């Protein structure tokens, strides 16, 4: 995807898999998009580079991502259960978020998942303290971190819901 904006500004503007009751565990409230550190922006660029291939939904399907649910403000959630483990891997998100658009699916964000059995506290995530891991108690208890790397979210890169995502249908 080409941008007319300088890359750092474009990345700063670009701003998540399991729905249900959540508890925000960040020490800060939603960081303003332009408050992200250079290190966080570099890591977000790595996530974008690694997931760009999933703009083609057939690639996500072939790589094992399967539909889980539609969550208002998050979109259609697809999870690759085979990569859910105790590790936070920027380049291999366990979840992808899509929205229906023009008779296809548009990639809007990623989600990282770490089972609660791996750590009682939020996992180390992106550099800095702007990411917000959430404890999800329903179903498989997990820590979840969403990043709206493909659809800007004026509420913050790591916010759970993006007001620009249409309601589930």
For the regions a language model picked out, list residue spans one by one.
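Positively charged n-region of N-terminal signal peptides that target proteins for export
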Residues: 1-6
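Bacterial N-terminal signal peptides
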Residues: 8-20
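Sec-dependent signal peptide cleavage junction
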Residues: 20-32
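Generic detector of short alpha-helix boundary/capping microenvironments
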Residues: 7-8, 85
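Primary mode marks residue(s) on the alpha4-beta5-alpha5 output face of response regulator receiver
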Residues: 29-169
